[in-house]
Regions:
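Conserved beta-strand in the GNAT
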Residues: 2, 8-25
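Nucleotidyltransferase catalytic core that binds NTPs
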Residues: 59, 70-72, 77-334
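Active-site beta-strand termini and strand-to-loop segments that position acidic
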Residues: 4-6, 87-88
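Short glycine/proline-centered loop/turn elements that form peptide/ligand docking sites
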Residues: 40, 61-63
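Conserved acetyl-CoA pyrophosphate-binding loop and the N-cap/start of the following alpha-helix
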Residues: 30, 34-43, 146
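Conserved GNAT acetyl-CoA-binding A-motif
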Residues: 47-60
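N-terminal charged segments
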Residues: 1-4, 76
Length: 334
């Protein structure tokens, strides 16, 4: 949206993207006139009309107080760079409570506590120190043999694995399908607690770039903010190690992994970067799978995905997803 003066010069603007407010600015000649307040109020109204009632925004540190006065609450900040905020006072704390409840009520935890006669909670930190409680975050767009290998390795090396599936629908394969394929492809493992990432584990798709001077600075801010939030999640669940797949061909992921390898140990969380599984002389990637689907290369697909994923894509239910992949101009980075 935009606001204009009498000569139709734009003097204030703001935008909606998904469940976020962004790109908000007021002309320097019109500061102090309450225009930003009007812009934010209008954007919130638009979002509510769209059915988006849980809203988020990113802002510079020196603007956080202003948005706080408009009903937004700080989730996390990187000093001197960026603040992540939401319009629910207890939004993030309620999310952490939900994760803890999911963990406590899971069959994994029930079986584990029954076998060990000790309850895993924040109050039993000494118990947790003796356990390897791992975390994996994956988009699985879609679930491949590479994902399966990473999950199997992490589960084998851990007492309990918290597996977070990115729930934002910014991918060619919708979340409901991605989740289904992850669950089916890991059903043979008995120490996994599954979580939907919710809106707090931040994806590249929703992280804004307009605050930063270049792509590396964007990635550094994204990584630091995402990891700050992850540390709080880890503390709530007793997670003491995180696994991640190596991305030798991705500068973006390389920066993220580099920051993660430094930041997590500072918070008593180890970081294990796992070399990627290969097939046909190359690393297995979801983008290669999407390319195979786009080109109807079923023989290649069979070498890249587990039976559960293959069965889905050969079923009638997959037709709309495959059609979407075929219609996309770029299936490599999506």
């Amino acid at each position: 949206c935009g606001m204009y003066d009498d000569e139709m010069n734009i003097i204030a603007t703001g935008s909606c993207f998904g469940n976020t407010l962004r790109c908000m600015a007021v002309s320097s000649a019109h500061q102090g006139e309450g225009l930003m307040n009007q812009i934010v109020t209008h954007l919130i109204s638009v979002q509510f009309e769209r059915g988006n009632t849980h809203l988020f925004l990113y802002t510079k540190c020196n603007s956080a107080k202003f948005f706080g006065d408009l009903g937004f609450y700080e989730i996390a900040r990187i000093d001197g760079q960026i603040v992540f905020m939401e319009n629910r006072k207890t939004g993030f704390s309620a999310y952490l409570e939900r994760l803890k409840k999911e963990s406590e009520q899971s069959e994994v935890m029930k079986r584990f506590t029954s076998d060990n006669t000790q309850i895993l909670s924040e109050t039993s930190s000494e118990t947790q120190k003796d356990l390897r409680i791992a975390a994996l975050v994956m988009n699985a767009n879609p679930f491949t043999l590479g994902h399966q290998y990473l999950v199997e390795k992490t589960a084998a090396e851990s007492d309990i694995l918290h597996l977070f599936i990115v729930s934002e629908d910014q991918s060619l394969v919708p979340f409901s399908v991605r989740k289904q394929l992850v669950l089916e492809g890991t059903a043979h493992l008995d120490n996994i607690i599954y979580h939907e990432s919710g809106p707090y584990i931040i994806s590249n798709a929703t992280f804004p770039s307009y605050f930063q001077k270049d792509a590396d600075a964007v990635m550094e801010s994204h990584a630091n903010l995402d990891l700050t939030i992850f540390v709080r999640i880890a503390q709530a669940l007793g997670i003491n190690c995180r696994y991640v797949g190596e991305e030798p061909n991705s500068q973006v992921t390389g920066i993220y992994n580099e920051i993660m390898a430094k930041k997590l140990p500072e918070n008593e969380i180890s970081c294990t970067i796992v070399p990627r599984k290969e097939a046909n002389g190359a690393v297995i990637s979801a983008s290669t799978v999407r390319t195979a689907l786009k080109n109807d290369n079923i023989e290649l697909l069979k070498t890249l995905v587990p039976e559960t994923t293959l069965r889905y894509f050969q079923s009638e239910k997959a037709a709309p997803v495959i059609a979407k992949i075929k219609a996309a101009e770029n299936v490599v980075h999506h």
